[in-house]
Amino acid sequence: GHNVEFLAGPDGVVLPPKSYINREVVMKFDTPGIYLYVCSPHSIMGMIGLVVVGNDTSNKETIINYDIGGRANKKLKTLVNEL
């Protein structure tokens, strides 16, 4: 199964709790910046993603240096460099 777990976001933002497996997630983002999320069971295989709110990439360095582990680190660098 899959879920959504936010690992990082803009400074000062309280990240939501990890979602339950195989449950739909609806999020509202009020703070501009980059948010990093993973599928917890599959993150080391590269199942990660980014949400960019308001075209604000000011926290890009924080996000690109986050250590997820496994294949995810390479994928994270690719995703951030595409911004």
Where are these regions (language model features)?
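Extracytoplasmic copper-binding redox domains, predominantly the cupredoxin/blue-copper superfamily
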Residues: G1-L83
